[in-house]
Amino acid sequence: MQSQGQNNIYTVVKNYIPKNVMATKNRAKTWLYGYNEKYDLIIISKDGTLGEVYEISNVKIGLPKHPDKFENDDKKKENQVWESKELPKVLKRIQTIFQWHEAPPNFKSQWVDYIESEFDKREQGHWFKNNGVPTYITGTHYMYLQWTKIDVGHPDFREANRIFYLFWEACKADKRSFGMCYLKIRRSGFSFMSSCEGVNQATITRDARIGILSKTGADAKKMFTDKVVPISNNYPFFFKPIQDGMDKPKTELAYRVPASKITKKNMYDIGSEELDGLDTTIDWKNTSDNSYDGEKLQYLLHDESGKWERPENILNNWRV
């Protein structure tokens, strides 16, 4: 963990919110996700609480208040690190939500708390102790670390990536934002991180389209087939909608039947919502100034955008 200083990628802003205001609103859990104009603060907490305020690239970002207990409290300080957990073997045998509905009631009762907890972490983020320090990761970061397989297996926890995801969550929370431009070093994991976010968004969003562009059409296709599709296929059944077509599509990944949230209240039900299509797709296009012209996108991944080959120009495409 870095010590604070002018070369850090973030700083913790002390006493940014008056203590009496912080205490009152935390008790009532009335801090709202999004931009808070009064305090010029982007709140990424989704549980109504506010804890530390980070400043990242001159943007004030409010994290949730840390809990009193952590999953790895039972470990010695020097052994407290991020650890991904394998899906329980019995749940690996279930491939679709339909197989879950056919499972015996006692089996569902045994595993519903685990599944509910995973949905909560995906939505609200996750706390753990890192060498004794309470550490918050966003839900998107959790999905990357826990449920994404990359070329070397599970991703490592990196503090720089944590800050990236905090800033990205602020971009999503702030309705004034058009997105994020990220300049990176090699092997930083961005292609996998952005692919993970594309799949994460697609599997929870209805009637949306997610696009991929890269420096060439061949690179965009490779990102789709080698990263996006495997990430989707490796999701556990409770996060994975039913998709149209092949398991390994080459041009479009189409989600139809959604993976609705499993809770104690609905774990025995087969409601009509499971049969309504998501109608969300992920696809890629050849690199061109007018790629995706006139098409509404929920999320556009521009990979290697600084390497477009002439005569194509990323600036022209951005104006489309």
Identify what each model region corresponds to.
Residues 2-320:
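Phosphate/NTP-binding elements of NTP-utilizing enzymes
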